[in-house]
Structures are given as structure tokens and as C-alpha cells.
UniProtKB/Swiss-Prot annotation:
Protein name: NADH-quinone oxidoreductase chain 2
Organism: Paracoccus denitrificans
Main location: membrane
Record: residues binding [2Fe-2S] cluster: C96, C101, C137, C141
Cofactors demanded by this protein: [2Fe-2S] cluster
Length: 239
């Protein structure tokens, strides 16, 4: 699939001071002269800051890493996780359309997106707050059909559940991610058939619990949310 940059581009891009510090910390993971190896996390951080990857953002990251613009552009256009056009200011919804989800109703979820957001993928809703696209397998096949919204998975969806999620996002809420039908993690719908007497007591699986604890879900990253740690420097610095 041919991927092109959006014809709508901002005049410039630069990291916030905190995100610039974060990006430079990523560069220290690699030997001197190999800083270009940090291109994926640095591009990802730029996308988290702005919501999508503009040409100025790609070129800024290339300059930061000392690499030709075309090399950074090759990476940005190769990986579908990079959004090359503006996305909804509240949420970008990615509907899994691969086999299991398709069999379980992904086409119906896509119809909801067309009706409530925009008729075409990657187009913004009338108020600019939402966008959507169909993507390949997101790896939650047991809990099909599902969607990724921001950083989180919303699983075991129905037409009604997805429509309600969109309405809640529009109202300023951030619904709890994970299964939307009461299932714990990826257990069988009828409940566990082995180790049935093992009572964990957790309300959510580890990834959902972490998302709730950090409060880092669909919001943009300004650099203050995630601590900058460089444990790989401890040994070489003698700390």
C-alpha cells in the first residue's frame, strides 16, 4: 500500500524540553556513531506529542539523529503505526479487520465508525475530534472483535458497545480499556476450566491495571508523564 504525507502540513515542529531530553536519553542506548538506530522511538515520541507525524516532525527527528531526511521518511512510511495525516483530537480508532475479528463482526464496527465519525478512513469527523481506520491483526484474537483506541485495546465489542464508547469519549470520559463484556483478560467466555480454584482477586489484567494506574491512555505525551530513566548508563558511569 502506497503511503504519502498529508498535503496539509504545519510550518514547524520541535520537541518540548522534556521530550527532547527523553529522545536524547534514547540515543544513549546505542554506540557512538549509531544514534540513527533510535529513529523508531524518536519518531514515535514525535507522534505522541502531536498525534501524527508531519513532514517537519520527520525532518526534525532526522536532524536530531544526524541522518538524511529520506532515511527517516522511509521508516515513517514503512510502518503503519505512524500516522501520516492529522488524527482526531480526542481519539483515533483502529478497528482490527483481520480474519478472527472480521468473522466476529468487525465489518459492523467499521459501519459504526462510518456513521458516527466519517464515511472514509483517515478522515476527520466534522468537529475534528475523531478519526478511524481499519488495521491488520492487533493480537487479541480471543477477544474479537476489538479496536485499539489511542494506546489501549477495547475488546469483545459489539455495535452498541463501540457506539457507546465513542459517545463517552466525546463526553470527555476515558472508558476502562480491556474486555467490554466482563471477561477477565482472555479467559474462556464460560470461565476457566483449569486452575479454577485459583483466586487472583484482580479486577483487571496487568495491562489494563497499568493503564489505569498511569493515567496514560489516549492523551498526548508532553514529556512529563513518563520518567526519563537510563539504567543502561549505570554500569558505564560506575553508578
Amino acid at each position: 500500500m502506497l503511503r504519502r504525507l498529508s498535503p496539509i502540513q504545519p510550518d514547524s515542529f520541535e520537541f518540548t524540553p522534556a521530550n527532547l531530553e527523553w529522545a536524547r536519553a534514547q540515543m544513549t542506548k546505542y554506540p557512538e556513531g549509531r544514534q540513527q538506530s533510535a529513529i523508531i522511538p524518536v519518531l514515535w515520541r514525535a507522534q505522541e506529542q502531536e498525534g501524527w507525524l508531519s513532514r517537519p516532525a520527520i525532518e526534525y527527528c532526522a536532524d536530531l539523529l544526524g541522518m538524511p531526511y529520506i532515511r527517516a521518511l522511509e521508516v515513517a512510511t514503512f510502518y503503519f503505526m505512524f500516522q501520516l495525516q492529522p488524527v482526531g483530537s480526542v481519539a483515533h480508532i483502529q478497528i482490527c479487520g483481520t480474519t478472527t475479528c472480521m468473522i466476529c463482526g468487525a465489518e459492523d464496527l467499521i459501519r459504526v465508525c462510518k456513521e458516527k465519525i466519517a464515511p472514509e478512513p483517515h478522515a476527520l469527523s466534522a468537529d475534528g475530534r475523531f478519526s478511524w481506520e481499519e488495521v491488520e491483526c492487533l493480537g487479541a484474537c480471543t477477544n474479537a472483535p476489538m479496536a485499539q483506541i489511542g494506546k489501549d485495546f477495547y475488546e469483545d465489542l459489539t455495535v452498541e458497545k463501540l457506539a457507546a464508547l465513542i459517545d463517552r469519549f466525546a463526553a470527555g470520559e476515558v472508558p476502562v480499556p480491556g474486555p467490554q463484556n466482563g471477561r477477565f483478560s482472555a479467559e474462556a467466555l464460560g470461565g476457566p476450566t483449569a486452575l479454577a480454584d485459583l483466586k487472583g482477586g484482580e479486577a483487571h489484567n496487568a495491562s489494563v491495571a497499568r493503564a489505569l494506574r498511569l493515567g496514560d491512555s489516549i492523551k498526548r505525551i508532553d514529556g512529563t508523564e513518563v520518567p526519563i530513566t537510563t539504567p543502561w548508563l549505570a554500569t558505564q558511569n560506575g553508578v
